[in-house]
Each structure stands twice: as structure tokens, then as C-alpha cells.
Regions:
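Active-site loop-to-helix "anion-binding N-cap" substructures in soluble metabolic enzymes
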Residues: 2-258, 264-265, 269-336
Length: 336
């Protein structure tokens, strides 16, 4: 069972290009060569989320979902981590590798879902639900993680909740993922915070059904950050890395409708060139497109390596508290 209530939601600042350097006359191939040189010189590793632009995904040493990137950050022997994702991901890399220097190439790479919860709003919810164990999705700030018992990703959220000794859970901040978890773990009483990922929340089942009329034989794969009606229309519900595994379950299927941020199509097409991947459209007829994930370009990575911008720093007390919640998460196996 679950209980969803609404907090006051902070609005993420607009993506800004204030810090984006301009190199209009440098061909991409030359820029990539310079990045490769600087990467070796700095003993750096470049990590990229599956939602990044194709050029960044192809350049990265490792591309994956939040959990996979967290594991990679914790295990790397590189001196410098350049994290091509959004701010909370770079923070998590710093938390898990406090001795490494971690850089976010573009300061505009925020997250509206992470902005939907603050330590103060979490405290309010703790007062409303005393005795509940706080499970926080990694799409959150380091300060919120530090005030949580354990974190989770979309790849292990169900296993994390099942692993807890308590029957009462406060799940934050994504209500759609929280609902999905509550359905999979009905034996626990789950109170659900009311944040959303705007990119996923815009999608409606009617839009998915319209796409299915064009491709009736298609397999639908949805991210659990999608609304409940979209999840119910899907054949598979999983994280982005889980989507790669899900495709392998349908060896005879040729067409897949993918209900997540459009950047995932690139990874799927690379892995399965003989299959067709159709991006699910939002209710306003547009691709599911996260502006924060798409703000990082090749020149941002170049200047991050060249000028060592922009380094992630965290208060030691916050870092230690957040580390405990992340390490507890990483001790739990993946769901998908």
C-alpha cells in the first residue's frame, strides 16, 4: 500500500550557457583528438550517462545508468573523473571516491527531480511519518542523501525496499518510481513523496497507444519514472541498463518502443543494429528530451580537462552521511 502527498516543490533553474565556451572553428574530430590527449595526460576517466548526446556517449570510457556509473566511480583508479551527466551524479561520484577529483563539465546540468526535495522538506515528511525508514532515489542532492537511511536507483529500488527489516518506508522523491516499487512490494507500507521527472512524467498512455497503432508488433519498454498508465501499457519496466537486457529477452522481435529519455535510443541502436527502436513521444508530440542531460557538449569536456573546471566539492559531514546511504545501496543487488 502507498500514501502520496504533495510538498512544496522547488523549481530547477533554467539551463544556462553562461559557462559554455565557444570553439566554432574547431572540427569535432580535432576536438575529440585533443580530449583524448588531455585524458591520457590527466589520467582521467570520462563517465557518461545513457541520456547524453551521442558524441559524448561514444567518447566516454564508460556509459551506463546511475547504478553502473556509481560502481564505476567507486572502482576507478583514475586520478580525475569527468562526469558527463547531471549534478547529483557527479556528487555521487565524489561521495564514493572522496580521494578523487571529480568534475562536471557544464554547470547547467541540473535536475528538476533532485530540486523537488530539500533537507527541510524531507524533515517535514519525517515528522509526518515518524518511524518510517527513508529510501531516497539517487536523483537527489548530497544533503538529502545524508539525511536518508539508504539510497536506490531505478535498477535496484525494489530490491532495496525488500532488503529492509522495517515494514514502513518513506520513499523519496519520485512518486512514479515509488508507485512502481509499492506495487512490487505490497507487503510493506510505503509513503511516497510527490516529486517527478518532468521528462518522463509528460508521457501518456494514449501517446504510447498511438505509436503502437503504427507498430502493432512492437515490444514496449518503459522506465519506472513514467506514469502508472504508461507502465501498465509496457511489456517491460526497467532502468536504462535493464532495457539493454530486456531487448535480449525478445530475440525474435524486430521493433521496440522505448519510453524513456531519447538519448537511450543511441545505446540501444549501437548494441542491436539489426533492430528498430522507436522513441515514445510526449503528450505534446515531442521526443522525451531532458535539457539538462543534453547541455554538455564536446567543448565542455575539453575545457573541463584543460582548465580543470568545474570541480565538485562537498562538506565533509554531508559527504560522510551521504556515503553511508550510498554504500548501503550498493550492497543490494540489481533488480534489472
Amino acid at each position: 500500500m502507498s500514501d502520496i502527498q504533495s510538498p512544496a516543490v522547488a523549481v530547477s533553474p533554467a539551463v544556462t550557457d553562461e559557462y559554455a565556451p565557444i570553439l566554432p572553428d574547431v572540427p569535432a574530430v580535432e576536438l575529440i583528438a585533443q580530449i583524448e590527449h588531455l585524458r591520457r595526460e590527466q589520467r582521467a576517466v570520462i563517465l557518461a550517462h545513457n541520456y547524453q548526446i551521442p558524441e559524448i556517449q561514444d567518447l566516454a570510457d564508460f556509459t551506463g545508468d546511475s547504478l553502473g556509473l556509481a560502481v564505476e566511480a567507486s572502482e576507478t583508479d583514475a586520478d580525475m573523473i569527468v562526469f558527463c551527466g547531471v549534478h547529483f551524479m557527479a556528487e555521487s561520484a565524489k561521495i564514493l571516491s572522496p580521494g578523487k577529483r571529480v568534475f562536471l563539465p557544464h554547470l547547467g546540468a541540473g535536475c528538476a527531480l533532485a530540486d523537488a526535495i530539500t533537507p527541510e522538506s524531507l524533515d517535514d515528511w519525517k515528522e509526518r511519518y515518524p518511524g518510517y525508514t527513508v529510501v531516497t532515489y539517487v536523483n537527489s542532492s548530497a544533503e538529502v542523501k545524508a539525511e536518508s537511511h539508504i539510497c536506490c536507483t531505478s535498477a535496484n529500488a525494489v530490491s532495496v525496499v525488500r532488503s529492509l527489516d522495517t515494514d514502513k518506508v518513506l520513499f523519496t522523491p519520485d512518486r512514479n518510481l515509488g508507485r512502481w516499487v509499492a506495487e512490487q512490494v505490497p507487503e510493506k507500507e510505503i509513503a511516497i513523496y510527490d516529486g517527478v521527472c518532468p521528462t518522463h512524467d509528460v508521457l501518456r498512455q494514449a501517446s504510447v497507444n498511438l505509436t503502437r497503432t503504427e507498430y502493432p508488433e512492437a515490444v514496449v519498454i518503459a522506465h519506472p519514472e513514467c506514469r502508472q498508465d504508461v507502465v501498465e501499457a509496457a511489456h517491460e519496466v526497467c532502468s536504462t541498463t535493464g532495457m539493454l537486457k530486456a531487448v535480449e529477452k525478445y530475440p525474435h522481435a524486430k521493433i521496440f518502443i522505448i519510453a524513456t529519455e531519447s538519448g537511450m535510443i543511441h545505446q540501444l541502436a549501437k548494441r542491436f543494429p539489426d533492430k528498430q527502436f522507436i522513441p515514445a513521444d510526449g503528450c505534446i508530440g515531442c521526443r522525451l528530451h531532458c535539457p539538462y542531460m543534453k547541455v554538455t557538449g564536446l567543448q565542455d569536456v575539453y575545457f573541463s580537462l584543460l582548465d580543470e573546471r568545474f570541480e565538485i566539492t562537498l562538506d565533509e559531514e554531508v559527504l560522510e552521511g551521504a556515503r553511508l546511504s550510498l554504500e548501503r545501496m550498493m550492497a543490494v543487488p540489481r533488480d534489472n
